[in-house]
Regions:
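Conserved phosphate/anionic-ligand binding catalytic regions in large, soluble enzymes, centered on
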Residues: 79
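Extended beta-strand/beta-hairpin segments
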Residues: 1-69, 82-218
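Alpha-helical metal-binding/catalytic segments enriched in His/Glu/Asp
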Residues: 75-76
Length: 218
């Protein structure tokens, strides 16, 4: 987004590494639009998402979890390259193939739906001079350092601040965020201007094959 300052989306205070602020607007069905601003770099990205036929969606864009999977494997790649530079390991070739599996049971309409996630499958193709034992330790240490791994290793309590039509609502059983209510983004989404067009950032290649997993469907 070229005019993030103009439309008013500001990044939160950067406490550790990076902090992001996300504005999300819901459309019909499962379609959503989001603006995400990074405190570290100041960049603002526009995302759209949808769901496929498994949730009666139109499959007009990636599902939200696809962005998580993409960010996860990108984080692993960054950590591997950073550790290689730190330890003086020359990597001549590196390719990561990651499969994420998510489960779903029950009905959203009946409020009985329960979602879950299976273990991630990460395949690493690498050409370097480390022997097998040293390479395994190197890759484990690199992927372990990913911020995503920190989120997945334990249970994290989220903090909430709720409002409706500008009036604050109680969070009930959820933990409350200590801070003021942020203003409604209103129609600022429509005023977002894209940067110079860049083709090929994402392209659709087809539906993900369904895989039977324990406890639900992928």
């Amino acid at each position: 987004v070229a005019n993030a300052d103009e439309i008013g989306i500001e990044a939160p205070k950067n406490r550790i590494g990076d902090a992001v602020r996300t504005w999300v607007r819901s459309f019909s069905g499962f379609q959503k639009k989001a603006l995400v601003r990074s405190a570290k770099k100041g960049d603002t990205w526009r995302f759209v998402s949808d769901e496929g036929p498994y949730l009666n969606g139109h499959d007009a864009a990636c599902c939200p979890l696809a962005f998580l999977s993409c960010g996860m494997v990108t984080s692993y790649m960054s950590e591997i390259m950073a550790l290689a530079e730190q330890q003086g390991v020359e990597i001549r070739k590196l390719k990561l193939i990651q499969d994420n599996y998510y489960t779903m049971q029950g009905s959203m309409m009946k409020r009985t739906m329960v979602g879950g996630a299976e273990n991630i499958e990460l395949q690493v193709e690498i050409d370097c001079d480390l022997d097998d034992m040293a390479l395994n330790e190197f890759l484990v240490n690199a992927t372990y350092a990913s911020p995503l791994n920190g989120l997945m290793r334990g249970q994290v309590e989220s903090l909430f601040k709720l409002s409706k039509n500008g009036a604050e609502l109680p969070t009930a059983g959820a933990l409350e965020l200590d801070g003021a209510i942020l203003p409604d983004p209103s129609d600022y989404f429509a005023n977002a201007v894209p940067m110079a067009a860049v083709d090929g950032l994402m392209s659709k290649v087809g539906p993900t094959p369904k895989k039977e997993v324990s406890g639900g469907t992928a």
